[in-house]
């Protein structure tokens, strides 16, 4: 909008993305005392409105990205034409789908150790998963937690050997294998997780005040996977250090392309890069 263009932003019916379920953001520059995720998103939204961005709380049903004029069609049937499109749909953390998980999201259940680990200082917590991300999150969380129990439903791990050995060598980490999570327990906050032994069927409760789900992320690229180049997991591929995709005039940013960092500040920076790339592309294609 500051470039005197006319950006239309489709926020979806629930705007704000992953930050809307983050209780406290302490690693975003400019907020010395931290800020809640919803407050940060409200401020970003108001800033965009101040510069004239057209923000629409509508879900996008389909896109047509080929050709000089792109089109975006909403679930309500409205079609918007554009010369350039920036994709910033993000990625969604995979969840277990067990009782109590979504009800206690942000109240002891999290999918981001970097975001929320600090709030579990000197507490007993569980990390659910068996891949590299689970090992990394468990190891990271030992900086804050009194103890970390790594829960995996199988005997064998998908994690690389070095990541697994690092977790095993940490005195604060206890590893439970062949344990499936049946439910997250607690009323207003997490008090434990109910586990079922996949071999014997025995059910037990692990007393914890935090549950970090680390079973991967899925990029929200369903709308464009058939027309844009993506990696095998669905992350949109961009060219070099730019945000340009495999279609001219289409750019992608944030967690839609980033499987490594997934932080608010890196997503914001990536979005800025996409805006600059789009502005320059439009200037070159008058």
Regions found by a protein language model. Name each.
Residues 1, 134, 138, 252-253, ...:
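Small-residue (primarily alanine) positions within well-ordered alpha-helices
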Residues 45-74, 79-82, 142-240, 280-286:
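A Rossmann-like FAD-binding core segment of flavoenzymes
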Residues 11, 17, 62, 77-78, ...:
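Short secondary-structure boundary/capping segments
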